[in-house]
Regions:
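N-terminal Sec/SRP start-transfer signal
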Residues: 1-39, 49, 328
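Juxtamembrane interface helices immediately C-terminal to a transmembrane segment
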Residues: 13, 17, 36, 40, ...
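Alpha-helical transmembrane segments of multi-pass membrane proteins
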Residues: 14-22, 321-342, 346, 350
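Small-residue faces within membrane-embedded alpha-helices
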Residues: 32-39, 43, 284, 291, ...
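Small-residue-rich transmembrane alpha-helices
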Residues: 46, 296-301, 308, 332-366, ...
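Basic-flanked hydrophobic alpha-helices used for secretion and membrane insertion
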Residues: 46-267
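N-terminal membrane-entry
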Residues: 270-287
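Interfacial "coupling" helices/loops that link adjacent transmembrane helices in transporter permeases
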Residues: 290-334
């Protein structure tokens, strides 16, 4: 028999499959159920991870990968175009109201560009962010409630806050607002950058002020490499431009950086030691080996039932290589039928079970990972 006769092998494989439909249906169901098991498991696990991350982001105050703190304008312009940066966002903190009714609330006044506002959960659901050269401001419903202002575009309000120890009262026109999220640590009153400069001029404060942070340029970034090695990427960006973040006393090239600890990848990179790595690797191998054994046993039973058939084929001259091809074709056909069904059903099962599992966990945002 010609080993290269693949057409004959495929035809024999299909006829063999059609001759044992009931057994093949059981095999397809076994493959599908195994796929359902692992798909649902990973869907739930990834969804819980995403939920933890979302909860952490709200505590941190944003979901950018990391950032560079208290920059001068020159440093900001140097760093923002680094090839490791996918997107950047600018924030300039101006001050905070400290008197009643804000004495028990954390409210920050400052400028944030659209990227930064988005990463800080400050996307207006009504209206928009303030435009340059205006007296506009955008904030959340909690701040408006404390001010006694009904959310309405064009509403005017005054806000008294401290700028580096200097008290100032400023009038604003409401141009947008978003819903207050009690999980987010700070509320924000966003104003144009032109208004930042006007407030600084009025109060006589020059960045970085006496506190070392007022109206400095803070740049948060999303990295092209993702969240796997945030700290290393931030250090490399600084090195590209002759800066470092290790020691303030090493020279005037020090720049402070921050890593968003809300990302589980960032936490793992900082806390990953050999025992943890071995435990994760062992768990992954155990899960993979379990799936392999389940599906292998299904095919082993199927092949065992056909052992007489394969013996007859060998008697008439079929080579071991051809027999392996026949079995591979059958395995591929059964897998192509069972795995897609299992993936679809597993995702649906995982999606239904995820909210139930997350409901038992405190402080986790309900998210279903696709």
């Amino acid at each position: 028999m010609n080993v290269a006769n693949r057409k004959w092998i495929r035809r024999l494989s299909w006829k063999s499959l059609r001759a044992a439909r009931t057994r093949n249906l059981v095999a397809v169901l076994a493959i599908a159920l195994t796929t359902v098991l692992f798909t649902a498991l990973f869907t739930i696990a990834l969804s819980i991870n995403d939920g933890f991350q979302q909860a952490n982001f709200r505590q941190v105050g944003g979901w950018s990968h990391g950032g560079f703190k208290y920059l001068t304008e020159e440093q900001f312009l140097q760093l923002r175009d680094d090839p490791l940066i996918q997107e950047w966002g600018l924030r300039r903190f101006v001050g905070m109201p400290v008197e009643v009714p804000f004495n028990k609330s954390h409210v920050e006044v400052g400028y944030s560009d659209p990227n930064q506002a988005h990463w800080m959960y400050c996307d207006p659901v009504v209206g928009r962010l303030p435009e340059e050269g205006t007296d506009e401001a955008a904030t959340d419903t909690r701040v408006l409630e404390l001010l006694g202002i009904t959310p309405q575009l064009g509403a005017e309000f005054t806000l008294t806050f401290e700028v580096d120890g200097h008290e100032t009262t400023q009038a604003f026109t409401l141009c947008g607002w978003w819903e207050y999220d009690e999980a987010v640590t700070a509320s924000h009153v966003l104003i144009p950058q032109s208004r930042v400069e006007a407030v600084l001029s009025e109060t006589g404060v020059t960045p970085p002020g006496a506190d070392g942070m007022t109206a400095t340029w803070n740049m948060d970034v999303m990295l092209k490499s993702g969240s796997r090695q945030i700290a290393q990427d931030l250090e490399q960006i600084l090195e590209h431009h002759g800066y470092q973040n290790e020691s303030r006393t090493a020279g005037d090239n020090y720049i402070d950086t921050g890593v968003n600890w809300g990302y589980t990848g960032a936490q793992l990179s900082e806390n990953l030691d050999l025992p943890t790595l071995l435990a994760v690797a062992a768990l992954a191998l155990l899960i993979g080996f379990t799936g392999y054994l389940i599906i292998y046993n299904v095919f082993q039973i199927s092949v065992t039932n056909d052992i007489r058939f394969y013996g007859l084929l060998k008697t008439i001259g079929t080579t071991p290589r051809q027999l392996r091809r026949i079995i591979r074709h059958q395995a591929l056909a059964l897998s192509l039928a069972g795995i897609p069904l299992g993936l679809a059903a597993g995702w649906l099962v995982g999606g239904q079970l995820t909210p139930v599992v997350i409901a038992q966990l405190d402080g986790v945002v309900s998210v279903v990972s696709v």
